[in-house]
């Protein structure tokens, strides 16, 4: 019988990490482990890390302390981007037993078994095992694409279609943490999606580091992938998680908004700055004019399409004028919400050398202003949806007697709780926006008849 019977997982960061954690958790379950919550005194903790910001690093350290407080005799395994970038730093954390780099995270069971053998061999000399075991290789040696998808954790599933990035933006460590851009073939990706179609999942979110780079300029590309996925029976919705504006072609936009049967009218597009001067310093592959054209193209086809935007404040050398340029650019854009990131210095990136360091209090103030703008944008978009008929996928989230879900164009809707509505796509009419900024709705059709 396996010495370690219960395993808990914690995922930091992006949807891609969630898809990989879910796949790794199934490896554990196939190996005889019971998956439990973090607080249920597991024998093994697996923490899948992010390293986009300094806060993500700090969160990992906090989780290790929390894990050892919950189960002092447990094994703590760290994997993910932080583990690839700074394995020695993690290994110095009290309580960490195993640190796995990018090439080894899907071999976690083998490394756990090896670690267990070492513990048994040195049980009379605990000092020999005080330092964590590191299994790590240079990211240049990471070439394989490992398919992943999430299942059982949420109403929707995250399907990994691409990994790595060749862009090397000056603020970003992801190419150092995940390696070169790579993917499976379209046929292999369709096979993975059909595994999800065989379950009760209604919505699949396509995820990766730079999904628009699918195919890396070869015979296959992201547009061809969307057309192939759209033909899969058994999945009601596909949603694109995030796509670079220079890779979001007009043919992708046209297909998703006019021809596709299953792709949601929702795009999340990273801008990062509305200042062309800052975009150049960031080594972004577009300028503000192209970004504005993409937004205009989407809205000209479907005014109800939801558009989310990533933006970074406090990039080195960002002046007040640069920030105001971003503010004014975003105010004039017909977008639905913003994801605002406060710039965080990252080791081995070029950004810190490109300009004067922006004081943290200035970064926070700029972030606050953009969050307020995002709230106004979202509220304005939601108001345009009142009276319209949409389809909502209700999720397993219950709070104070309400059930929540999202329309195809990503409006968050609430309705009085009914267990029968969970994981059902239901025709509704949006009736009002409440004080919490959520849409109330009228159920138009009995879900059992849909």
Q: How would you describe each model-predicted region?
A:
Residues 269, 310, 330, 338, ...:
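Hydrophobic, well-ordered secondary-structure elements that form the walls
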Residues 353-450:
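Terminal RNA-binding accessory module
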Residues 33-34, 74, 97, 235-236, ...:
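A structural micro-motif
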Residues 318, 334-335:
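Contiguous mid-protein beta-loop-alpha structural module that forms a pocket-lining wall or clamp
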Residues 1-213, 227, 251, 267, ...:
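Proteins enriched for Cys/Gly/acidic motifs involved in redox and nucleic-acid/cofactor modification
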Residues 76-77, 85-86, 198-320:
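Conserved SAM/AdoMet-binding glycine-rich loop
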Residues 56-58, 180-187, 215-220, 281-284, ...:
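Short, solvent-exposed loop/turn segments at secondary-structure boundaries
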